């Protein structure tokens, strides 16, 4: 019996090139993350960490040419409906100054819940416990 958990995220031969740039920011990158794994992505400034992570959220993905595949829970990322993507894939910036909507991480998370139609009572409860 195989005890390995199914892949949660698979990036296969991912390549990304920004417009009008001669070389890719990401080149032939492959990664599989299984449910429950904890992964640290580190490297020097400008090596492509943010570019890579932004590929996971269509609303945040930079313009450019992408090759390769990204599977999330066995489905092509581009085929997920917006609600599923919003519910299952989060994105919080390292620096509060770079947050998409607000300047506090918990406000950013609450904005995501609000856009999914979470009721006001649940939102208040989460804000009380700073989640």
Where are these regions (language model features)?
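A short, flexible loop at the N-terminus of ABC-type nucleotide-binding domains that lies
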Residues: 2-11, 15-28, 60-63, 79-81, ...
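The feature captures the beta-strand-to-loop junction immediately N-terminal to the Walker
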Residues: 42-44
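Helix-to-loop junction immediately C-terminal to a conserved catalytic motif
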Residues: 57
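Conserved ABC transporter NBD signature motif
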Residues: 65-76, 85
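Short helical segment in ABC ATPase nucleotide-binding domains corresponding to the A-loop/adjacent helical element
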Residues: 97, 102-114, 124
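Conserved small/polar residues in nucleotide/adenosyl-binding loops
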Residues: 129-131
């Amino acid at each position: 019996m195989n005890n390995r958990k199914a892949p949660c995220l698979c990036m296969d031969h991912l390549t990304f090139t920004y417009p009008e740039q001669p070389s890719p920011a990401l080149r032939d990158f492959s990664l599989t993350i299984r449910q429950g794994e904890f992964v640290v992505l580190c490297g020097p400034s400008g090596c492509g960490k943010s570019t890579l992570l932004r590929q996971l959220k269509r609303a945040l993905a930079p313009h450019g040419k992408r090759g390769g595949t990204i599977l999330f829970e066995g489905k092509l990322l581009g085929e997920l409906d917006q609600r599923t993507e919003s519910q299952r894939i989060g994105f919080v910036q390292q620096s509060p100054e770079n947050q998409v909507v607000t300047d506090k991480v918990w406000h950013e998370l609450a904005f995501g819940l609000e856009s999914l139609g979470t009721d006001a009572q649940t939102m208040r409860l989460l804000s009380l416990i700073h989640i």
